[in-house]
Amino acid sequence: MGCRKSSCPRHHTPKAGTFPPRWFPSAEEPGKKGGQPARPTVVISAGTSEHETITIARRRRTPQLKARHLLSAPANASDLSSSKLIFDVCRSPSDLLLRVPTTNSEHQQAELCATALRPTRSKRLMTENGTAQTGTVPVEQPRNGTMENAKLNMAEGDSSRMESGSKNTASPPVKADNNAAGTHSSPKKRRKVNHACVYCRRSHMTCDSERPCTRCIKRNIGHLCHDEPREPSKRARSEHEHSTAEEDGHSNNEFSNAQSMPRNVDVQDAAGQQILPDGTVALPPSSVSAVQHNTIPSSSAQNSLGHNSQQLLGYNEWLGGQSQFQDMHTFHPSYMFNAPEVTNEYNLLGDFLSSSLLDDGGMFSNDNLQGIYSDPTLINSMANLDNTALLQQAQPSQPTQSQPHQNDSVQGPSSTVVNDKARETYYMTAADPSGSDPPEERMNKLLKAKYDAGLLKPFNYVKGYARLNQYMEKNMKQSSRQKILRQLDKFRPKFRERMQSLTDIELILVEMWFERSLMEYDRVFASMAIPACCWRRTGEIFRGNKEMAELIGVPIESLRDGKLAIHEIIVEDQLVSYWEKFGAIAFDNTQKAMLTSCTLKNPNSSNPGNGIPCCFSFTIRRDNHNM
């Protein structure tokens, strides 16, 4: 039949609004047998006042209740089916009475019977889905719930408790345990590594231990992500610190260390030499003298062209530019032949930067310039050049009587000193490209920065012809040498005449296009398994693929930046035939390519009989000046 006493909260629920906000069961509560607590129950009653709140009371084995175990939270009787009720879990079972506020006139009552909670060592926040129905609905108390709305309900309880002005004391919120919440997981922070990659280190950003790192992959420069070479002492110390950090596992300290990363980072090249901020490098006296000797152009070559010597980069500036990009070559010497990187022009950046850094003043090749003359950014930048510097480069040299020549040394004007800030901007733009600009615009910005830094200058073809003549004197017969010189005398004056009619801006724009074309040929060479190479009209090879290097038996680095020439890999009689064919179609607009046969050789082989007979075709690229 059930208990008929009105004081039994299990079988009789008072009407809404007839009991105080805090209900304390008496000691004579039914269900007590032999001093044992009654079955834990949860009584939910709907109130009529807008300011009434839910009161959750915990009872120990004795009927005494303590105020610090009370917790209030707002709720709505109509939303009980979707709300979550918060309980303060303690060591012993409890009876919970909940007073539910309502904004309508309906009186809803519900009684939820729950099983006894098992004792736990620490207090935890438990949640339970309640169901608001008319009558009695038994619900089982879960042992593990979710923490999704725990903090929100507690905050709402505090605000509702202040509005109602009730005198109930709420217990302080208990910190949730991640282990108790099966479906909750805090966001995983990026852990700081001891040694960041070169680009994260320059940007002072947090890097990870993967190579390529996540940040470089998002910026589309994953193929360039690598660590800078370090000294053995620093490497050993960083490895020791890394192992210690893994054992300790202090993520907070690691985050603070990442925030306090020093702003100034010393860049070191592959040889371990420190590069100063101004781009200077400490060199022994022998290296200094060697560089000074190599940077002085030939006076006869300058007089033959009728031009003054171009501005020269000091050995400190040149070596600073070379060493900062040396790590790019040591990291991926043959990266251009990897299929995933064919479509990205910046995977060839290291080779592009190193090209023409050794070139001092003179003339250079010209090809089709469409797409460069239409760029207003480059034109405006070059139009703002110092007029004095341009006139000093274009006019022939006129020695004065008051200043006699001493040791025939060539000195550039003081106005042509390269700006350190412009050079630093170029290095950062080249090594760490960023932004969402199209590849064409990024390449224009890169070329503009290289020009502003004074590192983009015309190619000296006079040195190329002198190199060819020197090779023929040492390795070829007199008859073959005379035939080649006869062909050179036919087209070389025409090239010289047309080059002298061009302005300095036109010459630099042509050189920009040439370096852009080299990057295009890199993608073409990488996409086909056919030996191929690209050389200037004087014969210096500036690009080649690995198939070509394997064919003639040289490393791939030899087919870059003019280290090898076409006359060094072709046998003597076939070389004479090549120059005759080239002289015939050099200024003939009707002919562009020619298919012929030749015999290649290894430039390092002493036996000329070991030739490689093959059939090849060469294509001539011409510019707007028909060169």
Swiss-Prot record:
Residues 394-403 have a biased composition (Low complexity). GO terms for cellular component: nucleus. One of its GO terms (molecular function) is zinc ion binding. Residues 1-40, 129-148, 155-193, 225-258, 277-305, 394-416 are annotated as: Disordered. It is found in: Nucleus. Induction: Expressed constitutively with similar lebels in swollen conidia, germlings and hyphae. It comes from the Eukaryota. Transmembrane segments: none annotated. InterPro entries: PAS_13, Zinc_cluster_trans_reg, Zn2-C6_fun-type_DNA-bd_sf, Zn2Cys6_DnaBD. Keywords: DNA-binding, Metal-binding, Nucleus, Transcription, Transcription regulation, Zinc. This is Zinc cluster transcription factor acuM. It comes from Aspergillus fumigatus (strain ATCC MYA-4609 / CBS 101355 / FGSC A1100 / Af293) (Neosartorya fumigata). The gene is AcuM.
